[in-house]
UniProtKB/Swiss-Prot annotation:
Fe cation 2 binds at residues 87, 139, 171, 174. The keyword Acetylation does not apply. Pfam families: COQ7 (PF03232). Its main location: membrane. HAMAP family: COQ7 (MF_01658). GO terms for molecular function: 3-demethoxyubiquinol 3-hydroxylase activity; metal ion binding. This is 3-demethoxyubiquinol 3-hydroxylase. Its EC number is 1.14.99.60. Catalyzes the hydroxylation of 2-nonaprenyl-3-methyl-6-methoxy-1,4-benzoquinol during ubiquinone biosynthesis.
Amino acid sequence: MSPADSLLAAADNALRTLFAKPGAAEKSPADAVAEAALDPAEKRLAGALMRVNHVGEVCAQALYTAQAALTRDARLRARLQQAAREEIDHLAWTRQRLDALGARTSLLDPLWFAGAFALGLVAAKVGDRVSLGFVAETESQVAAHLQSHLQRLPQQDLASRAVVARMKDDEERHAAQARASGALALPAPVRAAMKAAARLMTSTAHYV
């Protein structure tokens, strides 16, 4: 893929992620359970948590798109593109949950996308194994974050819980695949900086 083709593909992905309603290749896990009756406070909490999870999927699209655009390894590009396609399902599922809960997406989605895209470009520029290291660390942190949401979501909101549980399993698998592909372990200061940035994003997206 030429640099121009990569740029066009990245721009197309950004527009689709930010402004189009995503379509899932696989049915949402929420479809298998009944919608619960939540009181207003429970609905607000579930909506806020699913908005945060939707932001995470916006960032995943940006990260994978940037890394796939710069790698010269065709096999790695194919793996990144496949992971991005799977994350589109997550993007669609979280958007569906937001709609069902009467909640909106984050107003700062373009900012989150741009930041994650820049991070992906930097990681890819350093090298493929570092790029895979960012994937492994990001997915591991996201999986831990999703586990915390399973503890916070209303117990009766089985639809949101089903989506989050499936996403957690997928993120853990993506992290394991990145490590198996030769991901470098990132230095502790980098991991700490990523966690700090994630905390800022999640605390902001909870409300905005």
